[in-house]
Amino acid sequence: LRNYIRLFGEFYVLDRDGNDITSLFTPKLKQLFILIMLHSSRGGFGISSKDLTRMIWGNDNPSKSTKSLRSVSILKLRKILERIDTVEVLFNANRYILQLSEDVYCDYLACLDWLKDKRVRTQPDFEYFYDIISKGEVFKGESFDWMDDFKSYICNSTVDVLSRFID
């Protein structure tokens, strides 16, 4: 595997050469990465600089040191993501957006795509979906208020899908 991001079960990232780069993500960088990804997956608008700072550092009116910390953290995250083909954190119109090419596989985004696709499902479709979710709880070990809506959506949708499959 290469260019791989797993958010179901244990957080796990492989670079373009298939090297495990998970350890490069400090807890704060992992939180930052997931936050930007989640907000980018909702219509591609990303997250405002103000909301990102409030959610990660808990400041509605950030000081210069908090803004500096945010900038340094974004730079560190970008440096890590350079190791994965065509993954970028963009800053446009005061919003951070995570952009991934189709060469990058992310189980969370694959799950969202699967859930959005309303066509009739076959046995192989359900097996593919099960393969995604069988790695474990989405964002395992992560517990932040801003994650609750995203976790709820995945959990509720998964129950709905599995209920239909059983019927």
Task: Label each region the model flagged.
Residues L1-K30, E88-R95, G136:
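Short boundary/linker motifs that mark transitions into or out of structured domains
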Residues L1-R6, S71-C106:
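DNA-binding patch around the recognition helix
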Residues V13, L52, L77, C111, ...:
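Short hydrophobic/aromatic patches on the structural cores and recognition surfaces of FHA
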Residues T22, L38-H39, N61-S65, I97-D167:
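Intrinsically disordered, charged and Pro/Gly-enriched terminal/linker segments
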Residues T22-I56, L77:
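Short amphipathic alpha-helical recognition elements used for nucleic-acid or partner binding
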Residues T22-Q31, N61-K64, S68-V72:
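An acidic helix/loop motif centered on a single conserved Asp/Glu
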Residues M55, N94, D145:
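Short acidic/histidine-centered micro-motifs embedded in hydrophobic/aromatic stretches
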